[in-house]
Amino acid sequence: MTERVRVAITGGSGRMGRTLIEAAKQNGIILLGAAIERAGSTLMGVDAGELAGVGSMNVAITDSLDKAVNDFDVLIDFTSPEASVFHTDWCAKNGKAIVIGTTGFNHAQKEQISAYADQIPIVMAPNMAVGVNLMWKLLEVTAEVMGHYCDIEIIEGHHRYKKDAPSGTALKMGEVIAETLGRDLEKCAVYGREGMTGERDRETIGFATVRAGDIVGEHTALFADIGERLEITHKASSRMTFANGAMRAATWLVEQDAGLYDMQQVLGLKA
């Protein structure tokens, strides 16, 4: 690829938004074309680079995708489920690709976004860290070999401000394991335990959630049998790992046809 990829970033003033701006600044292929913030923000007109602490980038924070329509090729969206659906609708109407890192979607919202994939290329992934996507491949192999003979638990931890639980990454871990074992996660998932729960059902997949301090993201899948257990863990120490993954997704996405993709495809881990 010889031409730079122009991106717009929504939620530009948030923790993840600022990290995405910093990642764009550091990336030799990416060019920041626009940074979007909600209407009424006191940061309108502030230089996005200055806001992110990386120096001037000559891109002012704006509240309008319409005004920036000619300034970018790919929208990178880590906001909220409602906002992401709105932004995907806008991209479909304006012929823009979109990378979605938002989590917490309900089934109907996922279906809405999937429908737009007939018109535009979309990467939608609950976690864009390379290590996490490799972990999902490891979970497939582990579930095939051990899953039918083990108790399976998924434990995740995030900072105190995270809104959804379990995390999208944890749910994806459960989906990967359940699909490999031929189970329906909606029927076999157990979200927390309390009181006299009785003996554990081996067919279930348990989830436990921690929300504390400034934990960036920690996920563990535990496969426990009598006499041994295997733990597969990923720990993120910086949001930059997610931001760099989003930049990688954007550079890949501009060369794709309309469709719904995930980070496994971006990284070449599946067709």
UniProtKB/Swiss-Prot annotation:
NADP(+) binds at residue 38. GO terms for molecular function: 4-hydroxy-tetrahydrodipicolinate reductase; NAD binding; NADP binding; oxidoreductase activity, acting on CH or CH2 groups, NAD or NADP as acceptor. Its EC number is 1.17.1.8. Keywords: Amino-acid biosynthesis, Cytoplasm, Diaminopimelate biosynthesis, Lysine biosynthesis, NAD, NADP, Oxidoreductase. It holds the Pfam family DapB_N. NAD(+) binds at residues 11-16, 37, 101-103, 125-128. Signal peptide: none annotated. It comes from the Bacteria. SUPFAM superfamilies: Glyceraldehyde-3-phosphate dehydrogenase-like, C-terminal domain, NAD(P)-binding Rossmann-fold domains. (S)-2,3,4,5-tetrahydrodipicolinate binds at residues 159, 168-169. GO terms for biological process: diaminopimelate biosynthetic process; lysine biosynthetic process via diaminopimelate. It catalyses: (S)-2,3,4,5-tetrahydrodipicolinate + NAD(+) + H2O = (2S,4S)-4-hydroxy-2,3,4,5-tetrahydrodipicolinate + NADH + H(+); (S)-2,3,4,5-tetrahydrodipicolinate + NADP(+) + H2O = (2S,4S)-4-hydroxy-2,3,4,5-tetrahydrodipicolinate + NADPH + H(+). GO terms for cellular component: cytosol. PROSITE patterns: DAPB. The active site is at 158 (proton donor/acceptor), 162 (proton donor). Catalyzes the conversion of 4-hydroxy-tetrahydrodipicolinate (HTPA) to tetrahydrodipicolinate. Belongs to the DapB family. This is 4-hydroxy-tetrahydrodipicolinate reductase. It comes from Shewanella halifaxensis (strain HAW-EB4).
